[in-house]
């Protein structure tokens, strides 16, 4: 009888400890996901500010200029960013139909003004961020096919963030080429400051 009681108490204690550990792990995972999303949104917002600044520097005619036949205009890149966010974040994470027509993003040679492109981008980003923010933990871990690749929801967040940064860099480079000026993104910031613990 005493052996059975001891075994039952040990099992209860293990279950209680296991539950506490599981609760801590779930809490840490929740914190990790919240931190990942917050930092992704920070990068997305930073890139939006830079991209908007570039578009505002350019003339309407500059928006559809291509550096060469093998490169895209700022207008094409913005349409491409909208398509990518729509396919990956809005359709995939939002569990809606994928209606992207990728080739049209690159074949366009006009049709949108600077302000229309920025509005289209801003609206797309706000919808994507809302969906990302409301995506469940299960959906963030679930694997799915997007554009022929297999991604988890977390992988999708990383992809749209880095993809946006990559193309924002192209827009910055092309704007500097066209305008021959420093865009002042880091004005007043000491980028030589050393790390602190």
Annotate each language-model stretch with its function:
Residues 55, 78, 118-121:
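A generic alpha-helix structural signal
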Residues 2-5, 11:
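Ala/Thr-enriched low-complexity intrinsically disordered regions
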Residues 34-41, 111-115:
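Active-site rim elements
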Residues 109-145, 154-166:
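Acidic/histidine-rich alpha-helical segments that form the ligand environment
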Residues 13, 18, 22-30, 41-45, ...:
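Short, contiguous alpha-helical
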Residues 57-64, 131-141, 178-182:
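Surface-exposed helix-capping loop/turn segments at secondary-structure junctions
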């Amino acid at each position: 009888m005493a052996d059975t009681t001891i075994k039952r108490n040990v099992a209860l204690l293990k279950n209680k400890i296991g539950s506490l550990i599981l609760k801590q792990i779930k809490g840490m995972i929740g914190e990790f996901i919240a931190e990942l999303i917050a930092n992704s949104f920070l990068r997305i917002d930073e890139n939006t500010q830079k991209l908007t600044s570039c578009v505002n520097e350019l003339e309407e005619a500059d928006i559809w200029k291509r550096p060469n036949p093998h490169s895209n205009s700022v207008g094409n890149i913005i349409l491409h960013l909208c398509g990518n966010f729509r396919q990956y974040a809005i359709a995939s994470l939002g569990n809606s139909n994928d209606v992207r027509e990728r080739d049209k993003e690159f074949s366009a040679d006009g049709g949108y003004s600077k302000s229309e492109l920025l509005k289209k981008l801003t609206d797309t980003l706000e919808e994507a961020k809302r969906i990302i923010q409301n995506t469940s933990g299960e959906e963030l871990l679930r694997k799915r096919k997007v554009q022929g690749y297999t991604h988890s929801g977390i992988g999708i967040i990383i992809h749209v963030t880095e993809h946006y940064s990559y193309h924002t860099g192209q827009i910055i480079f092309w704007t500097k080429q066209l305008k021959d000026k420093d865009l002042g993104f880091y004005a007043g910031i000491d980028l030589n400051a050393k790390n602190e613990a």
